[in-house]
Amino acid sequence: MDANTFIPEHFIDDVKTYLPAHLDIDDFINACRRPLRKSIRVNTLKISVTEFKQYAKQKNWLLTPIPWCEEGFWLERPAAEEQNLALGNTDLHLSGAMYVQEASSMLPPIALKQSIEHTNYVLDMASAPGSKTSQLAALMNNQGVLVANELSSSRLKVLSATLKRMGVGNCALSHFDGVIFGNYMFECFDSILLDAPCSGEGTVRKDADALKNWSIDSNIEIAQVQKDLIKSAFYALKPGGTLVYSTCTLTPLENQHVCDFLLSEFGDCIIPESLSDLFPGASKATTPEGYLHVWPQTFDSEGFFIAKFKKQASSDNPNLKVKKGAFPFQQFESKKSAVFMQTLKQQFGLNTLPGILMQRDKELWLFPQEFEAVQNKIKYARLGIQLGAIHNNGVRLAHEFATAFGKQCKSNVLPLTDTQANDYFQGKDIRLADVSQNTGEVILTLCGCPIGLGKWQKNKVKNSLPRDLVQNTQLITWAQSN
């Protein structure tokens, strides 16, 4: 138990007013004081669950399946490793093979899974730091268009870095207050996830001070923001589309009441869809409305709320707006495209790229195939994947090319040892045991996952890792420092 976890009495008094009858307040308080179990999600854009399990077994990691996410596991590591090597510094994390993600936060994308597997346009309205965005991209198998929005500039940078590491290629990043989507992107999306900003009452097991500034007045203020966002989400959703609303808080003010607002605002145009059968055992957390209200003691996780809706019919939006300004990209010339693709085939055995080659100044980008329909709706902070920089003698490939498409490359691919990978992430060149006759660029892999680019130079590979990604700490294995 963590005696330092701050749980104010007036918060407990409030919880007592809406705690379900079958749950006990003492169990709730005790659960809030227990350390949160570590959990991870396998990134199937880079590695299969079966392959990941094999690597985990070699490390003596104990994986316990999370019942609602087949890619998710609670994780226990050997004590020595746990004490000496941060989970974020392990090879499976650095390679993008996994994401450290709280178990209950995997639920909102799973609630959208059936919808997004058959749709082209998905919006993640409040995306950072990227756990759910990368999960959505994996469920979409990098197909279609995923618009990921984040209001905070600093969090947007974190989101961008996460998506690069995870090999996400179908994403467009935007930097707005989510309330603009209903006006500028009216009925553009087949599926929308609104994981709304909230009071975070369910996160106290991760953050002992999460409730330090808690008040009902604050709940009420946040709920108004959530209502504005969910109204915008409704307008941005196509008729027949699916909306999932979620928070990591417990109070009905930010959960059921926000859903009630949506239903009263749009009447028969939108209906709730029950999540009681989302996974075996979901009924333990199902509300009378069919929402999921996950309490910390229900599944020994963070607290979470998830609701799912189907848009039945359109409703007029009187505030439609149109973006001004020209689109800064143009399609890459067909002759140059052919030369570029031939180069990729010769160097890496890569025959195709899944998208449209676009140019902005001297930058070469790859956009999702279906992006044209929404490209002029808003100004995007970042689109697709930057493949490289255009020079007179061709294209100098970018780091992102490797992390996104290295898995499909068949030649000039170099698996790194732990020592070599440690050197790579620390910005050092990679020493080779023998002189290589290969020339040009090479895809570097770790745990079977592409992690970046290098350049063959006889008895070494020159490091091409961007400077902002270089890490000056012990990585991969703690035993080296003993």
Curated annotation (Swiss-Prot):
S-adenosyl-L-methionine binds at residues 126-132, 150, 177, 195. It comes from the Bacteria. Its EC number is 2.1.1.178. The active site is at 248 (nucleophile). GO terms for molecular function: RNA binding; rRNA (cytosine-C5-)-methyltransferase activity. The keyword Methyltransferase applies. Pfam families: Methyltr_RsmB-F, Methyltr_RsmF_N, Methyltranf_PUA, YebU_pre-PUA_dom. The keyword S-adenosyl-L-methionine applies. It is an enzyme of class 2 (transferase). Keywords: Cytoplasm, Methyltransferase, RNA-binding, rRNA processing, S-adenosyl-L-methionine, Transferase. HAMAP family: 16SrRNA_methyltr_F (MF_01579). This is Ribosomal RNA small subunit methyltransferase F. It comes from Pseudoalteromonas translucida (strain TAC 125).
